[in-house]
Amino acid sequence: MTKPMRSIFFLLLAAGVVLGSGLLPARSRRARQRDKAKAASAVLAPTPPMGWNSYDSYGGDVNEQQVKANARYLADHLAIYGWKYVVVDYYWYYPSGHVKGNPVMDEYGRLLPVTNRFPSAAGGKGFKPLADYVHSLGLKFGIHIMRGIPRAAVQQNLPILGTEAHAQDIVNVLNTCSWSEAMYGVDVSKPAGQAYYDSLAKLYASWDVDFIKADDMSRARDPYGEVYHGPEIAALRNAMDHSGRPMVLSLSPGPTQLCDAEHVEKNSQMWRISNDIWDNWPELRNQFGYCRLWASHVGPNHWPDADMLPLGLLRLRGFNDGPRLSRLTHDEQITLMTLWSIFRSPLMMGGDLPTIDPFTLSLLTNQEVLAVDQHSSGNHLLFTKGHQIAWVADVPGTKQKYVALFNLGESPEEVAVTWRQLGLAGRLPVRDLWNKENLGSFDKQFSARINPHGAGLYRIGKR
C-alpha cells in the first residue's frame, strides 16, 4: 500500500471509530438542541408577556419568601387571565440589596443569589430551586441582570470560563452605568468577551430561567452620555440562543431610540420605550408620545415596553420613603391600563400581589380589556384634539374596531369618534369594555363623557 493510500485508510478507520463510538451523533444532538432553542426563541413571545416584577414593591431588597408569596398569588388568582412570569429584579447578589461590599460570585465572576435572602440557593444551587418552585405553580421564572461584568470580578481578575483569558482582558473600565457602580462594560469584540456572556447564559439556563431582564442596555444618548449598547445586546442574544434553553430577553431602560428599532426587534422580545415611570400623572401623560412613536413596531416576538404597572401597594422595601398605595387616581389607573392595552405593551405588575385591593384586582382581571392587549391588531393613534386623544385597533376575525378615548384635561369632556374616522358605516352597536356593558346602537358616531385624566375603552361594530 502506498503512503498516500495508507493515510487515507487510517483516516477512514479513524472516522469509523468516531462514528461507531457515537461521538458524532452526540455532537449532532447538542447542535439540534441549540437549533431547537434558537427556533423556540423566535416565537417566545407571540403576544405581549404578562407577569409580576419585584422592583416597584421591593427595589433591590426582595427575598425568597416574598417572591414565593407573589408567585402563589399569581398562580391562584391571575394565571387564568394570562399572567405567568415571576421576575426577580436587581441586586439579588448583594446581601443588603444595595451596592455595598462585594457581591456574591462564583470563581468565574458570575453573580449568584445571596443566601441570606434566597436560602434555597445555598450549596451552589443558584436560582434553580426557586425556579423549580415557580414552575411547580405552572408559571415561568425570570431574573434581572445588569450589563457587563462585576467590578469585583475585575478587581480579582477572575478567569473567564472556557478560555485562557481573565476579567481584566475583556473589561472596558470607561464603559459604566450612570446609576449603578456594580459593573463594568465588556469588550465583546474580543472572543473572550463573547465567551463571558456565553458563560452567563449557560448558567441561567442551568437554573431553568425563562426570562432575562437586561438593564443598562437600551437607553441611548441621554443627558448622562449613555449610549445604546448594541454589541453587548447582540452578544447576550447570541449567548442565549446557544444556551440550550429558550429565554425571553427584555431590554431596559429607555428611552430606546427609533433609529435602533431594527436592532432591538432582531435581538430581543421586548424593550423599554421610556425611562422608569412611577405613580404620578406627568410621567403617565408622557407615555402617550412614546406609544405613538413606537406603534408601528408592535408585533409578535417584538414588543415595545411602556414599563411596569405602578399599581397597588408599592415600595414596601428597598426604598427610603416607605410603603404607599399607588398615587394615581382611579381614573388615571384606568387610563394607564387602557393605553398599555390599546398599544399592546407587555404587562408587568409592579405592586405587591398578596396585599392587592379589589379595584386594582379588577384592572388586572378584566378579560375584555386584556383581550385588546393580547389579540388586537393594527393599533395606532386615531387623533389628537387638544386634551382629547383616540386610539383604534382591529378586532381579529371581525369588522369591528376597538376604540380608546382619553381625556388628558383637568375637567370632564365629551370625546367623540365618527364612523368615517373608523372606516365604518351604518347603525352600529357599542360595548363598554371596562364596565362590560352594551351601550346600544348608534348612527354615524359615538361619544362618551370622559373624566379628567380618564379613559374609556369600547368595541364598535357588528361581528
Name each model-derived stretch.
Residues 29-68, 73:
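N-terminal module-boundary/linker segments of secreted carbohydrate-active enzymes
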Residues 48-54, 84-89, 140-145, 210-215, ...:
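Structural recognition of the beta-strand scaffold that forms the well-ordered cores
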Residues 75-223:
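Aromatic-lined carbohydrate-binding/catalytic grooves of carbohydrate-active enzymes
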Residues 139-154, 237, 241-258:
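Aromatic-lined carbohydrate-recognition surfaces of secreted/lumenal glycan-active proteins
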Residues 169, 173-175, 187-189, 195, ...:
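Glycan-recognition surfaces
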Residues 334, 340-343, 348-350, 384-424:
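Carbohydrate-binding surface patches
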Residues 335-383:
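Catalytic cores of secreted or luminal carbohydrate-active enzymes
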Residues 441-463:
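C-terminal beta-strand-rich structural cap/linker in extracellular carbohydrate-active enzymes
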